[in-house]
Amino acid sequence: MAKLNVGDEAPDFQKPWTGEGEFKLSERRGDWVVLAFYPGDETSVCTRQLCEYRDNADKLESVDAEMVGISPQGVDSHESFIAHHNLTVPLVADEGLEVAGAYGIKVAGVLRRAIFIVDPDGRIAHRDVKALGLSFTDSDGIAAALAEARAAAAAG
């Protein structure tokens, strides 16, 4: 799929996750949602990324948005990853990379690290796709992007 831009409708998906049942994006209409795509459980940068979110959970909770991590590993891998590092962000299993493909971040069979903020109307309010997998958007960056997206939505 082509690159998604701010204002585009966020592709809906339903996938297994570490929460109850399955995660379905369209069931979150009316709420802000942060989708944090990362390449893999237990890899060095991804572990740093998810641990940074854990260590700054208060900042992420203060932005009043549901945040989920998404990677190609299955729920069993995600549950082990969460337990090993005491992670606080629930994780979605995109084993076939269908979600990554729908969001335009599947490249050569892997996904790019990315943050998408979805507004209460189900539209992309912010996107940050990393060209290289060595850096990630931290909690401060997510909080700032969400504040900016909320301000833009309020301004109409």
PLM region spans:
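Chalcogenol-based redox active-site neighborhoods
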Residues: 1-156
